[in-house]
Amino acid sequence: MSFSPLIRQLIDGLRILPGVGQKTAQRMALQLLERDRSGGLRLAQALTQAMEGVGHCRQCRTLTEQELCPQCADPRRDDTQLCVVEGPTDVYAVEQTGYRGRYFVLKGHLSPLDGLGPEAIGIPQLMARIEEQGTFTEVILATNPTVEGEATAHYIAQLLSEKGLVASRIAHGVPLGGELEMVDGGTLAHAFAGRRPISL
């Protein structure tokens, strides 16, 4: 089916969202135009305001509309721990655990095949932040448990080791409430390698 230029532009715009393919974008566009024009206008206004008003925190690089995000602006946070994550969504996930330290947000993970080296993802800025702050005694590497995430964590751990700093890696393995028979072999191997004694 061929759409008019404005409808085609809307469909193409919606397709940039992760997980939204051609058919889903068409349904969304037609829903907004046919049944929810006021919702479409609210969406357009919210999107415009967010694109113009949201930037990156000058300390941790997460998304915020202020110079400092709420976590960096909070003087009650633990200045001895720094949690390194791959993206802003990871900050929100870690916050739900009750973590009270500081953050540094990389711009993804190392991926030489995609042209993403240390500079592209912000590792020099991470090292500068650690040096400038001077209070971190532990750097928690909370990159994703993928090949690239592991390589990124290993690379950062080596840099930290050269400076005499302690790096720790978040544990991963069998999910809470999960069944062993449903867990893939690689995940189970990580869980066995990371096992720890039961404290009574």
From Swiss-Prot:
Organism of origin: Pseudomonas putida (strain ATCC 47054 / DSM 6125 / CFBP 8728 / NCIMB 11950 / KT2440)
PROSITE patterns tied to this protein: RECR (PS01300), TOPRIM (PS50880)
First and last residues of each zinc finger (C4-type): 57-72
Gene Ontology molecular functions: DNA binding; zinc ion binding
Protein name per UniProt: Recombination protein RecR
Record-annotated Toprim domain positions: 80-175
Gene Ontology BP, a term: DNA recombination
Entries under Gene3D superfamilies matching the protein: 3.40.1360.10, 6.10.250.240, RecR Domain 1
